Amino acid sequence: MRYDAFISYSHAADGALAPAVQRGLQRLARRWHRPRALEVFRDQTGLAVSHALWSSIKVALDQSEFFVLLASPEAAASPWVNQEIEHWLSRHSVDRLLPVVTSGEWVWDADAGDVDLERSTAVPPALRGVFGEEPRHLDLRWARAEHELDLRHGRFRDAIAELAAGMHGMSKEDLDGEDVIRHRQMLRMRRGALAVVCALLLLVAGTAVAWRNARGEVTATNVALQRQRAATAAEQHRTEEAADQARSQQQIVEAEQQRAQKAAEEARGQQAVAEAEQQRALRAAGEARRQEGIAAAEQRRAQKAAAEARRQRGVADAEKAKANRAAAEAERQRKIAADEQRKAHEAAAEAERQREEAVKQQRIAIGRRLLGQAGEARDRDPRTAIQLGIAARHIYPGPQSQAGLVETLVRTHYAGTVTGHTAVVSAVALSGDGRTLVTDGLDGTVMVWDPTDRAAPRRLAQLTSSTAPVYTVALSGDGRTLVTGSEDGTAMVWDLTDRAAPRRLAQLTGHTDVVDAVALSGDGRTLATGSFDGTAMVWDVTDRAAPRRLAQLTDHTAPVTAVALSGDGRTLATGSDDHTAMVWDLTDRAAPRRLAQLTGHTAGVDAVALSGDGRTLATGSYDGTAMLWDLTDRAAPRRLAQLTGHTAQVYTVALSRDGRTLATGSEDHTAMVWDLTDRAAPRRLAQLTGHTDAVDAVALSGDGRTLATAASITRRCCGM
């Protein structure tokens, strides 16, 4: 048997909708003499009892012209539906696959040229990659109520017409017109049949009346004959004229009798016709009753299917409820296990914390004893005192041991002094490894020192290539590159690979006044300079012999007296006599971007320093204070603390690479060392009082263990 369409669907999702679609396709535009407009296969109506279910379905698929897919999440997950699609596509064109979405989502990915299976919950996996372009699908997600699943419902009838149009080989509008014509023909035929029946009934009644009239005429004729015979017998004696008249009258009567007989025969023929029409009417009525019986049977099947669908939904809901209960119980057990595991971890963590606390207290006690012994041995055996202080700091590297070690160092003769400049020493710099110290003076000289023996630093070289006073110096992290800034507005780049024989690589020009500040990034690729001309400049020194100026910063309104770069070179800080410091983004070094302006000092900002990670900024000012700033959000710096230990201008600040130690130098002839473990509450560790003049410069080695300070004439180097 050939089918016009095969319906593939999920019983759980569309047990009621699938029969309604089948009935609609079979009835829409049906001719009066045919039981169905289309032959539609659906598993519950098209299959007989068989031992080979899939084989029967395959036969139906092969004999079907169109494949109607009722797409839903349940159908997408059904192995039967996917198997039916795969078999259909192996033997038919995808053009004859008609998708009808009954629930879920059907989403087309225009970029991929395929159905979006991630967002399409109603699309079976078997349809991946089969469509050459976006298919037109019918949306029946609204059709759920019983009254919506009937051709008398306008929207449902319209949807069925759209689905059936292609199967009939005509447009939807033509199919609508055809259905209207068929409906009107059926009404006309019903009315005609009723009229014929009524006419037949009237004809039968008329024939019966005619037959009765004919019988009356025959009777009357017989009476007339009898009377005629009597008259003839009685009046035989009448004249020939009367006899002729009688014969003539007899002929007339015989003619009337013949007409009556013909009328009777015609009445009998009409009665036979009426009886035949009555039989046809009875057969038509029987066919009508049979059709009503078929309709009633279809309705009963539909009701049974709906009841079965409701039962299946009930079973599915019950299974879902059981699954939900099982999932809830599994989740409860998981939470119990997780809680027990958390308690076990907490107990283990508490035990570990108590053990660590015991070890910590033991280290603190040992460290305190060692610091006490160091204090006792400070005068009689300085070397032993320092060793004890170092041991105490190693055992417990806390603020107390750090302060004790610093105090021991500054109170012994192991703080070294270097001399040699004939004018004010304006700057000092230490390499990251603490092996190279550079000092500069207003006498125009720059000296290179080896501070390995901090008690007796050794001078390695003296740079005298400039006759102008040198105001500032900076060393790269590896100690191989030195930059100096001079009164004549120039900066110079030096190669210290051989520290005993420094070699000048380049001279930088561009400033129009004293270069008072220089700084190198951690990777040695970026140089920043600041000048009394009110500008700062950014240079590329990747090629040290041929530096390139990248940008000039002109936002300050007074001399730029301090610059500092973060370890990664992405952050620049500048300080100025305009009482402000500024933070710059150097991600694009050729186009620096100002992120923030820091205010708070009441006099010129003469010193800035950045920690290695760029999160901490220190500023020093002529107002006698130093300030700490949090640059975690560089666009919104936050002031952490104000350091007020000095009694005069703060000329210089230096931060260790880890940002935990700060050194400051002041006009009050002292340098101070601060513990920044808690940046919001800095703690002064030591005050260094060995200088007899203003401390113009301080420098910390990368590991924070060596501090160099410079006063107007002397330089000191001490261990930390």
Swiss-Prot record:
Binding site for NAD(+): 10-11, 48
Coiled-coil boundaries: 313-362
InterPro entries named in the record: G-protein_beta_WD-40_rep, TIR_dom, Toll_tir_struct_dom_sf, WD40/YVTN_repeat-like_dom_sf, WD40_repeat_CS, WD40_repeat_dom_sf, WD40_rpt
Pfam family, one: TIR_2
WD repeat boundaries on the chain: 420-459, 465-504, 510-549, 555-594, 600-639, 645-684, 690-720
Subcellular location: Cell membrane
PROSITE patterns tied to this protein: TIR (PS50104), WD_REPEATS_1 (PS00678), WD_REPEATS_2 (PS50082), WD_REPEATS_REGION (PS50294)
Ranges where the TIR domain occurs: 1-131
Signal peptide: none
This protein's UniProt keywords: Cell membrane, Coiled coil, Hydrolase, Membrane, NAD, Repeat, Transmembrane, Transmembrane helix, WD repeat
Enzyme class: hydrolase
Active site (record annotation): 84
E.C. no: 3.2.2.6
Chain ranges passing through the membrane: 192-211
Region (Disordered): 231-275, 292-359
Gene Ontology molecular-function annotations: NAD+ nucleosidase activity; NAD+ nucleosidase activity, cyclic ADP-ribose generating
Reported function: NAD(+) hydrolase (NADase) that catalyzes cleavage of NAD(+) into ADP-D-ribose (ADPR) and nicotinamide.
This protein's domain notes: The TIR domain mediates NAD(+) hydrolase (NADase) activity. Self-association of TIR domains is required for NADase activity.
Name of this protein: NAD(+) hydrolase ApTIR
Organism annotation: Actinoplanes sp. (strain ATCC 31044 / CBS 674.73 / SE50/110)
Lineage of the species this protein comes from: Bacteria, Bacillati, Actinomycetota, Actinomycetes, Micromonosporales
